[in-house]
Amino acid sequence: MLPVLFSQEIKTEELSEVVVYATNYKYLHSLASEEPAAIPVKMLQRKVAAFDLESSDYYQDDYDYYQISFYIPDGKILAAYDADGKIIRTIEKFENVKLPESVNNAVLDRFPGWVVSEDVYLVRYHEKKGVSQTYKVTLKNGDKTLKVKLD
């Protein structure tokens, strides 16, 4: 007896293009630079931007703004949202994440023979004032230790 084979005809339809913007695209756009941030930093920043305040347990109609904290082992972000879920400001701190190549090269060119032993990446975002980014780097050369701040 021969096996019975079935075939299925699949219709293909062309769909119109849909562009979706996050409510907090300005926040993400202001953090964009020529050199991408370390992966854990980008992931947490995207989570902050995509946070849906109105469907969260924290949301109540009575409040004008909300402060929500986000944590990962490498860092944390404290974000302030308005009642519509738009990010007003953030304070961000990440420890020992990969430095951007330009920052790493600038440190090594300025301090030859020194090695980066620790780093802290600080970010402050404000919807009206923009963003400020600072790196605090600890350098070691044998028994000597040097702390450097870069912006």
Residue ranges and their predicted role:
Residues 5-58:
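Sec-dependent signal peptide cleavage junction
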Residues 22-25, 83-86, 143-144:
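Short coil turn/linker residues within repeat-based beta-strand modules
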Residues 38-79, 124, 128-148:
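Exposed beta-strand-loop-beta-strand "reactive/processing" segments of non-cytosolic proteins
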Residues 51, 113-124:
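Charged, amphipathic alpha-helical segments
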Residues 79-117:
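Long, charged/polar, surface-exposed segments that mediate recognition or autoinhibition
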